[in-house]
Amino acid sequence: MFSHYRYKENSCQKREAIPDKSRVSLTFLQKRTDSSNVTVAVAVAVPIGAIIIVLSVVLIVVYRRCKKEPSMQDFDPNFEGDLYYLPKMDSSMNSANSDSNATEKRFIYGGYDDFLQPSIENSQSFKDYVRRINEHAPSAYNIASLASQNNSKLSVPSKHIDLSNKISFESLENSELIVSPQHSNTGQDCDQRCDSTSNPDVNEKSSHNNDNRLKSNYTSRSGLEPQCSREEEENIDRIRSIYNIYFEKSNSTIRSSVTSSIRRDSKLNIATRKSVNMSSQDNPNDTTLIEQSHFGSTTVQEIDSSSSANEEYEDATDYLQVPAPQENKNIASSVYSEVATREKVIPESSLSLTFPPPNGLSTRITSSIYSDTVAKDHIHSAKAPVRALSEGSGQSNLTSAQQYSTYFIDHCNQSNDDNYYYNYPLPLEHPQNYENIGDLPTPTQFIYSTSSHSLTSFKGRPKPPKTLKHVPTARLNGTALNPMDHPEMFYSSPTKIPSTSLTKQFCTPLPYQLRQSVVMTNPSELSMKPRYKPAGSLRNLIKAQYLPGNSSTTTSSSLSQPPSTLSNAINFRVSGLLDDTDILQPPSVGEILPFKASTEDLRKQLGTSHNYEITPYENVHV
């Protein structure tokens, strides 16, 4: 009982204290309304001030660091940059009282050594390079001019030809050339080159000479180029040995073709000389043949003399070059040389372009494993006039750099047009004759194959159609050749199949036949009888029976009926399905929807439609 009364007293005290707290809180809120502006200002200003202070500190640090970096780079021993400036040009080149080499100094530009290159190990080498850059040394212009002069002397032979260079007509009969003493070394080099194909000892000597030549060229250039390290020299020697081995292997495969071509060319030259001799004996007064022979002999000798000078700059790749045909005696620089003032055109009957026989040896070295046989169907005989320079006042002072390429043909074979060919590139046409599937090697044999195969270039098991013209494919050791290298051996002209045979006997069209047709599919194959029944109702069947054109159902009784009874018999509905007449719209209705899209117009149109009628019979079934 006592605790119960005490609880009541405490509850009364709490209830009495509640209004006092509400009064205190109200008074407190009313007092702090005056100081709210100060708190807002402090809350905004303090963060902004802190952010400004932090940003200013960061900017000061960055500015000091950027200002400190250039000073550190100036004293950095390992810094490599564009801070070193080249010194000024030599003042002596602009002075009036200069020595005899003033013109040379004008092109030296201060005597900078363009071939002096600093190493990139440290900055000290670059500083030494800057100190030594004022030392007088041959400039790039002078070196290039000297090199161009040497090349011009080697490429263009001298215009002064001695009388010993001329070849008499008697020397043609003995097939001997009179060589001047100053070019006597040229004949020896040519003899060594011709004999090297048959004598293996000479081949070894020539290869040794090529190695010595490479070494001499390398040592001669070593004065201008920086010294190589031992590792670089070892790499160079290793590469040189690899190339020598490759050249020795290639020499063994090319010797036979080179020797045969040299022999064939020599036989042709002897035949032409004999023919010229015979014709000159028949016509002693005719000097045109003598001039032509004399003109050709001087051309041969001049090219031999120029070849000796160019031989110094040849490398070990001489063995990879196939000798050009004997008829064309024109050097590379003759295209841009001087043109003679006096010319004459040799008639077509005396000159024509020749082409090697179809069964000749291969002239391709990079892909020597393939045969370059030329089909007779793709060769057309042609003739073209060839320009030759006339000789003036009985002296042949013409050089090979001033004349066009001349062709000398045997006059005994002028009437035989089958011996003269001109290689016109003809367009290749489809279809392509593929190899048999039996020639397709196994996957393990692809590694050891000498030619690249295409898996799509093999035809399938079924035999090809008889209309295709079969061309025998070239093979090497039972391996079919690649059509990319010899397309003329794999492609032939398409055969035209008459349209009557295609209509009578159906066959699968070939890809090139599909391109010739406008329609890719045969329309006759699409005309198949339908196996489905057309959609409709019993009304369509009855209408078809009562049509006047149907003779099987038209009788005298049906024709005697009035049209009203026929229309009533046709218009009755069998089911609630829509018919064709339900879809059709009579012309009196007009548009399907009204022009004004209002609900009243739409209701009026739906209520007055002519094709919607409800009968009690249809209502029951629907």
Swiss-Prot record:
Source superkingdom: Eukaryota
Entry's localization field: Cell membrane; Bud membrane
Bias (Polar residues) ranges: 181-201
GO biological process, one term: maintenance of protein location in cell
Membrane topology: Single-pass membrane protein
Chain segments annotated as transmembrane: 42-62
Pfam families with a match to the protein in the record: SKG6
Signal peptide: none
Basic and acidic residues bias: start-end ranges: 202-214
Disulfide topology: none
InterPro entries: SKG6/TOS2-like
PTM text: Phosphorylated by CDC28.
Segments of this protein annotated with the region Disordered: 181-233
Keywords: Cell membrane, Membrane, Phosphoprotein, Transmembrane, Transmembrane helix
GO cellular component: cellular bud; cellular bud membrane; cellular bud neck; cellular bud tip; incipient cellular bud site; site of polarized growth
Described function: Seems to be involved in the anchoring of CDC24 to the membrane of polarized growth sites.
Other facts noted in the record for this chain: Present with 56 molecules/cell in log phase SD medium.
Family indicated by similarity: Belongs to the SKG6/TOS2 family.
Descriptive protein name: Protein TOS2
Species of provenance: Saccharomyces cerevisiae (strain ATCC 204508 / S288c)
Underlying gene: TOS2
